[in-house]
Amino acid sequence: LLLGCVQRCFDPSVSTATVKVLQANGFEVVIPADQGCCGAVSHHQGELELTRQLATDLVRSMNAVEGDLDAVLVAASGCGHTMKAYGELLNGKAAFRAPVLDVQEFLADRGLLESFRAQLQPLPGVVAMHDACHMIHGQGIQAQPRQLLRAIPDVQLREATEAGVCCGSAGIYNLVQPEEAAELGRIKADDLSSTGAELVASANIGCTL
């Protein structure tokens, strides 16, 4: 499991919860202690040489895991989008020995155990799903997060009218173009608010922040 630099700093509870869910569904989770940055931020900045070095180091770290490796999982879509592009970035010189998957596509594909479903507490209320650009456009993942959310008893999912519109984070766009990013954020917030949702679910730490 990749922890993600920004996620580790700003909301480590995401990784903690991810590990708990995976273990509760029968999966062994390995977190290499020497894992570094995936290179997403430097990639956004166009620093390709630094990105390639970070990517090479991360591949080495993940491939050093002992025993069978079914997947390299990511719980931040910005990281996952970059890691899935390593083949092109590294020109085939280094590659993970297992596929890179967002944790949601992994769980949706493998299925949730009935013992896990039985432990899920009801969440009465309306939830809107925010589709991160790096997930819906970059990785083609849209149905899986909704499938998992619907496993929660009593949850009501409502769709925003502009689900595919950027929230303004866009990698580092909110840092280099703060005014334009803030306007995109306002549009996104208005759209999500119009659903009447009490909660907004997001699968990317950049969007959440």
Where are these regions (language model features)?
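Iron-sulfur cluster-binding electron-transfer modules in prokaryotic oxidoreductases
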Residues: 2-209
